[in-house]
């Protein structure tokens, strides 16, 4: 290796600082030393300069990038400006700043900038009257500041001298205009935020459980609102719903009165079932009837007759006061998917088993059981549901002579109250399920006449029809049959309507409606297990068999009461295999006037919402499952009658029983009162329990081996609208 090429032998940093490097920059002599080197032997791996003689040019590529960088770094950067230029620029900027500060509009610009800063950072707290504590960014405050600035400028006009500068004037005006726009935007944002917060808080106070807003109710200075002062609406509307009773966005609704929800097992005394609902309009109406019977000497109702005026007591006909058990009743407009829930009433602290927990923390089985108690108690008493619905929407008081039933009807209309809560449930369910053929002709006709007189009086005051199905609020999701929800008055009214229709030439009138009018609440979504109007149910058109106009007919978008009754009767009769065949679906669709798709969707939801919770509850209770329903499986299309599921033998084994009688009896044992029913029926020999699945909800007297009762209930379809001979 030659001496000239030794500088390429991976020289260290110290080597590059000596005179042996490629080139060095001597600041003293300002000369560049060049050396001719041969790098062929050193960079023979392809990473060095190409073979040959390196360039001797001063600006050629250096062998070491570090040396090449240091070469030009040591030279230093030449200054772009001289100190004199910096001085001149500083003087010009200083003059511009002084011109801006001395401008007459500068104080207004400063005020606007400070207002924008305060409007952005200052928290806004809304008081109860809807006003805000901070108005720093309001339009009124800006106008006040502007007037103050003009006044100050006019007072000091003779003391100030300003030389016009068009460029600076334009800049100042644009700056003030920009800040003013920003202030307006901040004001609008604050207004929208306040409006949203007030609406949100108001909506929460109307929808959330009462214990959440208990502190607000206690600290509020407003007087509590009683049901009598709430007008014809019966509840305060939410601003988001846009109702007539809705509060304005900037105001808070009046607080609610505290209520407690006693459990059925905590009820010690066995009073009338209507005592379970003092917070409902039904209790107020029936309380007025009892008070009218007790104080027949007076012509007008006394203030003390109202349940709330007596401290929650109900005067009976005997003169004794019966304590009302407070309970929160679900709103009739509640639906599984119809919007926000209006009930969701939690257990208050007055209930022994409340412990501050809401209804959502209760198990599914407990919720089904409690709601079943409410269901059967609501349906107790003839025409009570109609009175309840009418009084709910039109809370006026009838005269005493019209509220008081005739003397020969009192024994039938007001049966003796049961002794305990289980007998209450069975008694109420039995009254609802009584067939017209089991009622004496005189009692049935007289009751229908009295009920018709009451309905005609109601329509003479208000020509609005509220069907009994409005009481069916929150029970459809948990599988309580619709038959339980029907009171005996509706059964008799439908029977009378059917007989009258057969006499008038087959033109059938709607039960319970004058002149056959159908109310708006007929066939609401509460009857449908689906819980909402799906796309296929809104405006479905199907081919018509009789060749009607345009060859098509309208399919109802909601399920009628008769259709739900048929569907549920089929479901409870085929609990062993709740999968209807294609022929059965077609038959059901033809009888109900629905499409096969609607029938199929109903049974899909019924298996999920009715059958499956029953199986889950039996499993949680430790009982042996007596049914086998395959979850989330697609049933093979077959034209055969319902039978055991394909995997019944492998899943259930010897415990599986395809007998629908024993299956329904074992399945229905989780309903309240079923044990008492079984105990009573076993005392009458070998009569088989529950010959029909629907009998689990009936009165114990209907379980006796009486031929007419069994034959009337054991039909395949429970058609309550058909005339009974």
Swiss-Prot record:
State the DNA-binding region(s): 552-614
Q: Which UniProt keywords apply?
A: Developmental protein, DNA-binding, Homeobox, Nucleus
One cellular component (GO) term of this entry: nucleus
Report the Gene3D superfamilies cross-referenced here. Homeodomain-like
Q: Which locations, inside or outside the cell, does it occupy?
A: Nucleus
UniProt biased composition (Polar residues): 541-550
Where is the organism placed in the taxonomic lineage, from the top? Eukaryota, Metazoa, Ecdysozoa, Nematoda, Chromadorea
Q: Which CDD domains match?
A: homeodomain
Q: What is this protein called?
A: Homeobox protein unc-62
Tell me the ranges covered by the MEIS N-terminal domain, including all copies: 133-218
Q: Which family does it belong to?
A: Belongs to the TALE/MEIS homeobox family.
Spell out the SUPFAM superfamilies in the cross-references: Homeodomain-like (SSF46689)
Q: Where is this region: Disordered?
A: 214-258, 295-317, 329-359, 386-419, 491-555, 615-661
Q: Does the keyword Nucleus apply?
A: yes
UniProt superkingdom: Eukaryota
What SMART domains does this protein map onto? HOX
Which residue intervals are annotated with compositional bias (Basic residues) in the record? 388-400
């Amino acid at each position: 290796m030659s001496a000239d090429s030794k500088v390429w032998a991976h020289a260290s940093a110290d080597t590059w600082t000596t005179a042996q490097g490629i080139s060095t920059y001597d600041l003293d002599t300002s000369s560049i030393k060049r050396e001719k080197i041969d790098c062929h032997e050193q960079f023979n791996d392809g990473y060095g300069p190409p073979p040959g003689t390196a360039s001797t040019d001063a600006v050629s590529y250096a062998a070491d990038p570090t040396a090449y960088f240091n070469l030009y770094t040591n030279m230093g950067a030449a200054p772009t400006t001289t100190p004199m230029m910096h001085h001149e620029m500083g003087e010009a900027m200083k003059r511009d700043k002084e011109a801006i500060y001395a401008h007459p509009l500068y104080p207004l610009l400063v005020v606007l900038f400070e207002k924008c800063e305060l409007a952005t950072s200052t928290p806004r707290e809304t008081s109860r009257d809807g006003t805000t504590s901070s108005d720093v960014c309001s339009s009124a405050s800006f106008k006040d500041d502007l007037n103050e600035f003009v006044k100050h400028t006019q007072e000091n006009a003779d003391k100030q001298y300003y030389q016009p500068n068009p460029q600076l004037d334009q800049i100042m005006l644009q700056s003030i205009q920009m800040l003013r726009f920003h202030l307006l935007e901040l004001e609008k944002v604050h207004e929208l935020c306040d409006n949203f917060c007030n609406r949100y808080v108001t909506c929460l106070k109307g929808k959330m459980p009462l214990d959440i807003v208990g502190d607000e109710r206690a600290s509020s200075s407003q007087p509590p609102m009683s049901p009598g002062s709430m007008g014809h609406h019966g509840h305060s509307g939410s601003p988001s719903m846009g109702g007539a009773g809705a509060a304005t966005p900037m105001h808070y609704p009046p607080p609610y009165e505290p209520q407690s929800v006693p459990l059925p097992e905590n009820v010690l005394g066995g009073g009338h079932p209507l005592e379970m609902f003092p917070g409902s309009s039904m209790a107020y109406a029936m309380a007025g009837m009892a008070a009218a019977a007790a104080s027949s000497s007076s012509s007008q109702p006394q203030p003390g007759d109202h349940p709330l005026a007596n401290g929650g007591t109900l005067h009976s006909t005997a003169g004794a006061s019966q304590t009302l058990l407070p309970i929160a009743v679900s709103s009739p407009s509640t639906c599984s998917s119809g919007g926000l829930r209006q009930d969701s009433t939690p257990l208050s602290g007055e209930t022994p088993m409340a412990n501050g927990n809401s209804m959502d923390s209760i198990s599914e089985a407990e919720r089904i059981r409690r709601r079943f108690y409410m269901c059967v108690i609501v349906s107790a008493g003839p025409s009570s549901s109609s009175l309840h619905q009418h009084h709910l929407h039109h809370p006026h008081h009838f005269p005493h002579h019209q509220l008081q039933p005739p003397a020969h009807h009192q024994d039938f209309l007001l049966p003796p109250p049961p002794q305990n809560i289980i007998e209450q449930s069975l008694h109420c369910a039995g009254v609802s399920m009584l067939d017209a053929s089991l009622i004496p002709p005189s009692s049935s006709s007289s009751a229908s006449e009295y009920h018709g007189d009451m309905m005609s009086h109601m329509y003479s005051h208000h020509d609005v029809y509220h069907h009994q199905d409005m009481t069916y609020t929150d029970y459809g999701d948990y599988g309580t049959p619709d038959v339980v929800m029907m009171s005996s008055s509706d059964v008799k009214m439908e029977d009378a309507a059917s007989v009258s229709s057969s006499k008038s030439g087959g033109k059938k009138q709607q039960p319970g409606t004058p002149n056959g009018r159908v109310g708006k609440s007929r066939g609401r979504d509460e009857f449908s297990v689906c819980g909402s109007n799906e796309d296929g149910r809104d405006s479905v058109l199907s081919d018509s068999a009789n060749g009607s106009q345009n060859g098509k007919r309208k399919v109802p978008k909601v399920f009628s009461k008769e259709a739900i009754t048929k569907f549920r009767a089929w479901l409870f009769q085929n609990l062993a295999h709740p999968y209807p065949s294609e022929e059965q679906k077609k038959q059901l669709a033809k009888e109900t006037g629905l499409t096969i798709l609607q029938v199929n969707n109903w049974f899909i939801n019924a298996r999920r919402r009715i059958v499956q919770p029953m199986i889950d509850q039996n499993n949680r209770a430790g009982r042996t499952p007596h049914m086998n329903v395959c979850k989330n499986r697609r049933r093979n299309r077959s034209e055969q009658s319902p039978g055991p599921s394909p995997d019944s033998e492998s899943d259930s084994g010897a415990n599986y029983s395809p007998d629908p009688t024993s299956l329904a009896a074992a399945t229905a044992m989780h309903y309240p009162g079923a044990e008492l029913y079984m105990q009573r029926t076993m005392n009458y020999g070998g009569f088989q329990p529950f010959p029909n699945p629907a009998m689990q909800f009936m009165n114990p007297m209907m379980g006796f081996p009486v031929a007419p009762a069994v034959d009337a209930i054991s039909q395949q379809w429970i058609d309550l609208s058909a005339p009974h001979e």
